[in-house]
């Protein structure tokens, strides 16, 4: 009969009673030692064979199993005197304050008790409400100085961390004195509390009697939980828990013998406190108020609490996150020639990682050859598994034997092959695209190869980043990874609904060089670039022009070969500096919808992209076409032609752009920042005017003529007006630099097309750095009444407060360099602090939201069925599948319908 599967309904935690500890114990431990001189476990010692065995050749005396099979068994130590369990110290204090010192009843009247029990029934299982009631009961009972049940006087109890309780008593004369409550007295008081009162103090009589919080018996964990290790020198090193238990047993034995010998109370109390210290640090070695237990080397011991807590602890380190097999990690390198959904895997890794493949009649011959190749020859196999589940390791001497035995139904653990599905991940994994499924491409050398377009979701660069690769081991896992996680399914970001996997840097500059006005290519170049990009065409289109008998094709015509044949889209791109020219084209399209190609070419302008039926008629390609976040063209291809077509387009367009940029040349150097004399004169003029403006503002402030901005003081008004004047000066200087450098300048091309950087960066390189700021204000910290000694005290002028008039090209003065370093320092500190804060915030958020899910009715619920949101995200829309927050783009549907109808005539 099959075993009936059961679902866990709930888990209850309780406290172990002394009886339970003794019952589950296999041996009482009395000897504070581990092994004898022969290296054999001592009976009654901490490595007693009844607690399990870890040494090969020995058998467990409790279950009879050998090392590796025996799970280990608990032991126990009978404590000579009770000690407080540090984890319950605060709870004990609360319970002592709430109950009578004589009769043990809770210090509430019978009517109040009845009323609170009724309230508990009403709250049911709502934890927060219950906790509130328990807090209220404690507050009320604590203030009662006479027991309502037996009438005996009560005394306040002071708790001294970590485990000391004082009763503030009064003598006959009314003088207050402190009486220390030893753990035995505490335990006696807790024993008096009747079971019926326990729910009112938040305890359950069956699972957690209060006196169990004071230990009389200490459980000793199994040997398997605290194994010894043998060092290279042959010396045995014990686990931290074993060290601590040795201390506990040694002091416990001393305390026992002193009690039996009738030693003075003072000595007994000292030893008792020492036992309490050892038990406390055994449970938690980070208890505040006492020094941590340390090794001879000074390293604090890792005891029970430290094994569970924190990032390296049992929960986060071994349960939520654990190390896995079938994974690899190495440095990443760029490879523009592989597809976005591929990953280049080094041959060494492909031969080490395996995929289990079942032998069928279809793949029998292929797998047989792999078995014959063995582990040393690629493509081979490392193991085979027979139908009984026996693993056979393939070695040079058994390859032919195993290959002969191989039959349908066996499993071969073969090397990674091209096309296998693997998971690729870069840490920190901040969003779901930090781990995606790629197809294997086995390659030489020792680094993973990654297509450049896939860097943004991983936030990867190639300055030494390492990435992880995981190999799914079952067909189900591979299918799941392929369907849910493959790279092309994540081109659109779920954050903002625009492309995240897109052309970057060189791809965008190259796209511009290919498609800008006046870019023409000869037949040999066209054939080369199409072959390089992997574009399959039956024959080349007609040349755009013939010059001196040479056929020339425009970059726009070549780019059009990559586009779907019925794609129509138009938009203003980043290069649209002359709105009038863009408006002329928009008007033409509005009037005719499908204007004549020649009409469009007559008005064509790099700043306005117009694609009609798969032909690029106007505009250069920049970040607005297939860049990250902005890529309108890529976005349309994903949504209207599917992710596979988008992958093909992205693969081809990036290779094409790389061919153009490498063959036509694209360099940026220091001479890109050279400005003519008249430009430098104009910039100096702008700086002079700005400084004069600032001086006028300071004068107006000192003469009391400055009008304060509403809500700001005079000083704040002055500062904000100075900041505005200096920011305007920097922007004007930037415009001058931009005008003189022009679109023939490669640095400007990068900034204007959105490939890399902004015009501000060029301004700072060529014109001037401008005002340095800390927290949005001018620099003000430094010497008294001035930032640096190079300026007069009280000088509020532009240069004295961090205005840098030089550019990187012209070089900064020492004062300017110092000001610039002040601004830069803030950026570094800010980055470091933000990273830590956002990481911790994300962890808390994940922990809070991890068990919420969207049900089939569209609501978001927690596991108990409580509704968190009636519609996911308040609108129920997935940004990946929506059009700017709408479920459908009506204009686009109308446009496509009209185009189809016009096409049919």
From Swiss-Prot:
Quote the cellular component terms of the Gene Ontology held in the record: cytoplasm; DNA-directed RNA polymerase complex
| Binding locations of Zn(2+) 2 | 100, 103, 147, 150
Where's it found, cell-wise?
A: Cytoplasm
Cofactor(s) essential for the protein:
Mg(2+); Zn(2+)
Q: Which domain of life is it from?
A: Archaea
What are the UniProt keywords, alphabetically?
Answer: Cytoplasm, DNA-binding, DNA-directed RNA polymerase, Magnesium, Metal-binding, Nucleotidyltransferase, Transcription, Transferase, Zinc
Q: Which CDD domains match?
A: RNAP_archeal_A (cd02582)
Q: Which reaction does it catalyse?
A: RNA(n) + a ribonucleoside 5'-triphosphate = RNA(n+1) + diphosphate
Q: What does this protein do?
A: DNA-dependent RNA polymerase (RNAP) catalyzes the transcription of DNA into RNA using the four ribonucleoside triphosphates as substrates. Forms the clamp head domain.
Q: What is this protein called?
A: DNA-directed RNA polymerase subunit Rpo1N
Gene from which the chain derives: rpo1N
